[in-house]
Each structure stands twice: as C-alpha cells, then as structure tokens.
A protein has these predicted regions:
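Short beta-strand/loop segment at the start of cytosolic alpha/beta domains
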Residues: 1-7
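Single conserved hydrophobic/aromatic residue that forms the stacking wall/gate
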Residues: 258, 262-266
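Short boundary motifs at domain starts and secondary-structure transition points
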Residues: 7-13, 249-253
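Active-site beta->alpha loop and helix N-cap motifs at the rims of alpha/beta catalytic domains
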Residues: 3, 14-133, 137, 142-150
Length: 266
C-alpha cells in the first residue's frame, strides 16, 4: 500500500490514522469543539458541514473554515458534505453539491476533502482536479447503509475512484451477517495487495462491523473514524478504545515483523 504525507502525517504507513468528527450546528460550538479536539491523540478532525446551521449559504460556510483551521493547530482538517443520498443530513441537487465543494476549496483551508463517488457522477475527475489545484487531497467516498455489496463490486468501485484521481478511496457498508464483515475485509486486503497505488479507507458499520474499524493495519485500511463523544456513523468506537486497540495491534505487527526477520537471518 502506498502512502501520502500531509502536514507530516503519513497516511498508509504504520498505525491507521484516527479521525474524529465535529457534528455541532453553531459556529461557536464548532470552534469550541475544534479547540478541544486539537489536544487529543488523533491525526485528523472531520468537519461535517451537513450538520452546520446554514450549510447551503457560502457566505456562512466559507468564513468558518479559516477559524476552524486555526483552532485545530496541526491536526489534519477533513471537510465533508454528507448528502442525504449517502446517509447525511443534507439533500442537495447536483449543482448545489458541486458549488458547495468549490466554496470549501476556494478557502484553501481543507487538507482533505470528501467527494462522494455517486453524487459527483461524471464530474468526479474534474472535481478531484479542482481539489488538487487547491492543495487538498481527496477522500472519494461511497456509503451503503443497507447492505454489503460483493467483494468484487467493492474492489471495482475503489479502483474506479483511483482511476478518477482520488488520493484515498473510501467505502463504508452495512453488514447483515458475519460473512458480510469478512467480505469487506477481503476487499480491503485485495486493494492493499493488488491495487496499492493509493491507501484506502474501509469500514463495516454497526456493532457487527466494529472489528473492521480496529484491524486496518492488518487488512489494509489506512484511516479509521472514532467516537469522541458524538458519533457520526453507526458503530463508531470510542476514541480511548480505538487508540488502545490500535496501539496493541501495532505493537504485535512490529513484533511479528521482527520475528520474521530473525527467522530469515538464520
């Protein structure tokens, strides 16, 4: 799996990087929360613009971003407009969605920006190009809150995101069985092993899929979302537990690699 480095944070290398969401409504609470999050053991903070009091008004969204960037200090800022179609709070027409993306990009404040695979449609490559011009890396996302598509479909979708120029393909799906969780993990491993051109972010949602949020270093998911007190998706694990488990698994991976090197040297 390849690696991208933003603000000194190497995504796709070592321990999965941790993202926590801001889902407050008022600007004052958004900035308060950002200041609190800036002191936590996390790599990135996601602003869910669709939860904002006035997300449709560029004159309200744009001024908030520079203040948010300052409040977060050196944490990566991921900006996300989660549409109703993808499980979010905001029903937008296509032009409204792309205009809001450009409003965010024009501020030059986002380190990463989420662009939804299906809502972007044929405009996806151009939107990704615009994001890169603005200096933002692209998380290209697809969500299914009802089911888990077959592994081949998940892989096909993430490869299409890569081909469109995305820096971090992301899929989040809902399992109906333990086999569904394995399907997501298998798709993740296939991407890491056979399509390593970019890191990927994957998760199986709900309590049943929680293991997928913790086992990224083993299976190939480069980032994970944690719950700092308010979850933004089903099955997000609390931040303390995420950090504890990621640290433990990272240590085991390091021990395993060292053991392999010792055996090879005999």
């Amino acid at each position: 799996m390849s690696c991208i480095t933003i603000r000194g944070c190497s995504i796709g290398e070592g321990r999965p990087k941790v993202i926590i969401p801001i889902v407050e409504h008022a600007e004052s609470r958004i900035l308060e929360t950002a200041a609190q999050f800036s002191t936590l053991q996390v790599d990135s903070v996601e602003w869910r613009v669709d939860h904002f009091d006035d997300p449709r008004t560029p004159a309200a969204v744009a001024p908030c971003l520079p203040k948010l960037r300052v409040a977060l200090n050196d944490k990566l800022l991921l900006v996300t407009i989660r549409t109703k179609a993808e499980g979010g709070e905001l029903a937008l027409r296509h032009t409204e969605y792309t205009d809001l993306l450009h409003t965010i990009l024009d501020t030059d404040c986002a380190d990463l920006i989420d662009i939804e695979f299906f809502p972007a449609g044929d405009d996806l490559p151009a939107l990704i190009g615009d994001a890169h011009t603005a200096g933002a890396a692209v998380v290209c996302s697809s969500h299914d809150f009802h089911k888990t598509p077959p592994r081949a479909e998940l892989v096909h979708r993430m490869v299409a995101m890569q081909q469109a120029g995305a820096d971090l393909p992301k899929v989040a799906v809902m399992p109906q069985s333990r086999i569904d969780v394995l399907e997501l993990l298998a798709a993740t491993a296939e991407m890491a092993d056979q399509h390593p051109e970019t890191p990927v972010i994957t998760m199986s949602m709900g309590a049943l899929g929680a293991v997928s949020r913790l086992a990224g270093e083993t299976f190939g998911s480069a980032m994970t979302f944690a719950n700092p007190g308010q979850a933004s998706a089903p099955g997000q694990v609390s931040l303390d537990i995420v950090n504890e488990v990621l640290d433990a698994l990272h240590l085991l991976v390091k021990i395993g690699r060292a053991s392999c090197r010792e055996r090879v040297s005999y």
